[in-house]
Amino acid sequence: MENLKKYLEVAKIAALAGGQVLKENFGKVKKENIEEKGEKDFVSYVDKTSEERIKEVILKFFPDHEVVGEEMGAEGSGSEYRWFIDPLDGTKNYINGFPIFAVSVGLVKGEEPIVGAVYLPYFDKLYWGAKGLGAYVNGKRIKVKDNESLKHAGVVYGFPSRSRRDISIYLNIFKDVFYEVGSMRRPGAAAVDLCMVAEGIFDGMMEFEMKPWDITAGLVILKEAGGVYTLVGEPFGVSDIIAGNKALHDFILQVAKKYMEVAV
């Protein structure tokens, strides 16, 4: 338990360190400083600097752990402890001046996510959770919304801008969910979406073709807040996620099964 608490404290420190970089540079990134690392996939010096700060913090405390970042890959290997970090979740939002973005720091032991910290710098909101210790935002305990009514439910979603699938699959799922629930929103940052479901702002979420650094931290927070989730795909590879309170999770999962191979 003491180790778990230490891992959590380091995750929070690391998320805040990365978030400070994002705060200092928000609204200042120029077009010439933005690189296209892949089709419709952008990165700037801010992402890289944030990742460096986060890695410095983690490796200072746990030099034998593996740290896997979105921008600069993995450092260390062979440890059962792996940190998955997204130094800037919501890059497109960030470079366009839209304040929904975050730093995501998650720890996995073996195959199990055990610690997560997600920091939203613009709103100064720090979410955190650890296995068996609950989920919090700025020190306040959070729980998923106790809502079983589809017509009153809010769902967040995300489609990949560069898909390996026929986009009609996602559009069909969206359509079927849209007709049944009260509202749907696309904030544009998966870690933020998971935290907002954990906090009870929304009831459910569906995101497709996610990487482990996108969701590891948020999954811990969601689960500790009483939420449930289903991952479809490769463990710690590319995966789809359906999450929420039990009622919304189960509904979205049944819709997804109509259009995708979901083995659960």
Swiss-Prot record:
<comment type="function">
    <text>Phosphatase with broad specificity; it can dephosphorylate fructose 1,6-bisphosphate, and both D and L isomers of inositol-1-phosphate (I-1-P).</text>
</comment>
<feature type="binding site">
    <location>
        <position position="88"/>
    </location>
    <ligand>
        <name>Mg(2+) 1</name>
    </ligand>
</feature>
<dbReference type="GO" id="GO:0042132">
    <property type="term" value="F:fructose 1,6-bisphosphate 1-phosphatase activity"/>
</dbReference>
<keyword id="KW-0479">Metal-binding</keyword>
<feature type="binding site">
    <location>
        <position position="86"/>
    </location>
    <ligand>
        <name>Mg(2+) 2</name>
    </ligand>
</feature>
<feature type="binding site">
    <location>
        <begin position="89"/>
        <end position="91"/>
    </location>
    <ligand>
        <name>substrate</name>
    </ligand>
</feature>
<dbReference type="Pfam" id="PF00459">
    <property type="entry name" value="Inositol_P"/>
</dbReference>
<keyword id="KW-0460">Magnesium</keyword>
<feature type="binding site">
    <location>
        <position position="185"/>
    </location>
    <ligand>
        <name>substrate</name>
    </ligand>
</feature>
<dbReference type="InterPro" id="IPR020583">
    <property type="entry name" value="Inositol_monoP_metal-BS"/>
</dbReference>
<feature type="binding site">
    <location>
        <position position="70"/>
    </location>
    <ligand>
        <name>Mg(2+) 1</name>
    </ligand>
</feature>
<feature type="binding site">
    <location>
        <position position="89"/>
    </location>
    <ligand>
        <name>Mg(2+) 2</name>
    </ligand>
</feature>
<dbReference type="InterPro" id="IPR033942">
    <property type="entry name" value="IMPase"/>
</dbReference>
<dbReference type="GO" id="GO:0008934">
    <property type="term" value="F:inositol monophosphate 1-phosphatase activity"/>
</dbReference>
<feature type="binding site">
    <location>
        <position position="190"/>
    </location>
    <ligand>
        <name>substrate</name>
    </ligand>
</feature>
<comment type="similarity">
    <text>Belongs to the inositol monophosphatase superfamily. FBPase class 4 family.</text>
</comment>
<protein>
    <recommendedName>
        <fullName>Fructose-1,6-bisphosphatase/inositol-1-monophosphatase</fullName>
        <ecNumber>3.1.3.11</ecNumber>
        <ecNumber>3.1.3.25</ecNumber>
    </recommendedName>
</protein>
<dbReference type="GO" id="GO:0046872">
    <property type="term" value="F:metal ion binding"/>
</dbReference>
<keyword id="KW-0119">Carbohydrate metabolism</keyword>
<dbReference type="InterPro" id="IPR022337">
    <property type="entry name" value="Inositol_monophosphatase_SuhB"/>
</dbReference>
<dbReference type="GO" id="GO:0006020">
    <property type="term" value="P:inositol metabolic process"/>
</dbReference>
<keyword id="KW-0378">Hydrolase</keyword>
<feature type="binding site">
    <location>
        <position position="86"/>
    </location>
    <ligand>
        <name>Mg(2+) 1</name>
    </ligand>
</feature>
<dbReference type="GO" id="GO:0007165">
    <property type="term" value="P:signal transduction"/>
</dbReference>
<dbReference type="InterPro" id="IPR000760">
    <property type="entry name" value="Inositol_monophosphatase-like"/>
</dbReference>
<feature type="binding site">
    <location>
        <position position="214"/>
    </location>
    <ligand>
        <name>Mg(2+) 2</name>
    </ligand>
</feature>
